[in-house]
């Protein structure tokens, strides 16, 4: 069973509740059909306390119904599904579909987004570092066929095969109509919000940036590259503010944190608050390659790290992951579900519903991360593959 977490309104001070959907501030409503009813759970919010939500939903007075005389706006419900790091360097050459275990979630979402942790190219020279990742051009078709609509390119592997590799990556993603925020032919393109318009009229803007920036990766006015959240944070925040001013929802993807650490650090938390102040409605983190907690602040959902969504086994990384499903009513974040998965032998996500790995996933995403944090020293000797934290 998936774990449902309520949106924690900052003004209420309440802890996130399990198995309940967030109720809007002024009206009691039925939760969407996808969410399990939870009549025994209590949710506190601004205007008081609601108990037995599913029962009270049928007691809404007639004047609040959707008759022609009502002034209540019709609901515009939609969902976004987010996964973590995606690497297709081994599955694509073998013709393996790593997304089949999560296909139901991808298919049901209005928007699906992941972090693309590789170049899509067969050209270019490898960057001088320990790990460089790429997949052939057919990988773009695999992503599109799986139902992925948006990929973040702001990470420390997009330029693993140089500027020509980035050019190929952008080209094939554009061909299959996948939005690709976070990189471009210059800094104006790299930082620019990419916008998707839904059938219900909602405009969703995506901004991506990375705080992990190898030398030569950052975009400039004259050079292609990625959006830099380490050396040009003011530009990232300006992009978020611009996105918020002209769109309904702003989703920010950030490559940050320390690899294999299950707890976010202060730099992540500080940047998250700055992004929220700038107008972010949803913050999706990646780079640690393991799960980190999911929190809420001012109706913004913060997933500090969504782990590896598709990734071959490497250096003791647990393979515990999941899909974050965020529910919106128009421009308003209403709640979220996290669907626990583990990676199979091919590196693809498969649902997990019980056992130690399931319990570990729940602990970490609900904030009990310290007991599962390996406490690794990132300066460890990388000559020992079993202990190397440098995986991507």
PLM ranges: what are they?
Residues 1-4:
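Sec-dependent N-terminal signal peptides
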Residues 8-10:
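C-terminal motif of bacterial Sec signal peptides marking the signal peptidase cleavage site
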Residues 12-15:
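Bacterial signal peptide processing site
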Residues 29-32, 42-52, 57-63, 67-392:
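Acidic, metal/ion-coordinating pockets
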């Amino acid at each position: 069973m998936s774990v449902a977490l309520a949106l924690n309104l900052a003004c209420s001070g309440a802890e996130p509740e399990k198995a309940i959907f967030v109720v809007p501030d002024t009206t009691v409503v039925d939760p969407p059909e996808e969410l399990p009813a939870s009549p025994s759970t209590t949710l506190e919010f601004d205007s008081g306390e609601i108990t037995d939500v599913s029962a009270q939903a049928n007691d809404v007075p007639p004047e609040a119904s959707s008759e022609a005389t009502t002034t209540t706006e019709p609901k515009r419900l939609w969902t976004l599904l987010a996964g973590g790091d995606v690497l297709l360097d081994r599955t694509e050459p073998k013709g393996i579909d790593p997304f089949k275990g999560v296909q139901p979630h991808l298919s049901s979402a209005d928007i699906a987004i992941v972090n693309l942790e590789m170049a899509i190219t067969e050209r270019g020279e490898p960057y001088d570092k320990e790990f460089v990742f790429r997949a052939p051009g057919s990988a773009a078709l695999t992503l599109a066929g799986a139902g992925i609509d948006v990929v973040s390119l702001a990470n420390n592997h997009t330029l693993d095969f140089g500027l020509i590799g980035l050019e190929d990556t952008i080209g094939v993603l554009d061909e299959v109509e996948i939005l690709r925020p976070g990189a471009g032919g210059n800094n104006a393109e790299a930082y620019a919000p990419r916008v998707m318009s839904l059938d219900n009229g909602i405009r969703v803007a995506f901004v991506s940036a990375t705080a992990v920036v190898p030398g030569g990766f950052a975009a400039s006015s004259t050079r292609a590259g990625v959006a830099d959240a380490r050396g040009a944070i003011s530009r990232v925040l300006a992009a978020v503010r611009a996105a918020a001013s002209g769109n309904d929802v702003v989703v920010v993807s950030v490559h940050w944190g320390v690899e294999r650490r299950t707890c976010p650090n202060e730099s992540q938390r500080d940047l998250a608050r700055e992004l929220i102040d700038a107008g972010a409605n949803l913050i999706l983190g990646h780079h640690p390659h393991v799960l980190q907690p999911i929190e809420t602040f001012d109706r913004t959902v913060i997933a500090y790290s969504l782990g590896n969504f598709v990734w071959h086994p490497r250096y003791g990384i647990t393979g515990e992951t999941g899909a974050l499903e965020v529910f919106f009513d128009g421009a308003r974040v209403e709640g979220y579900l996290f669907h626990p998965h583990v990676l199979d032998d091919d590196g693809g996500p498969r649902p997990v519903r019980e056992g130690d790995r399931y319990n570990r996933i729940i602990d970490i995403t609900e904030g009990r991360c310290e007991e599962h944090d390996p406490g690794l020293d990132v300066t460890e000797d990388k000559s020992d593959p079993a202990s190397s934290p440098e995986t991507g």
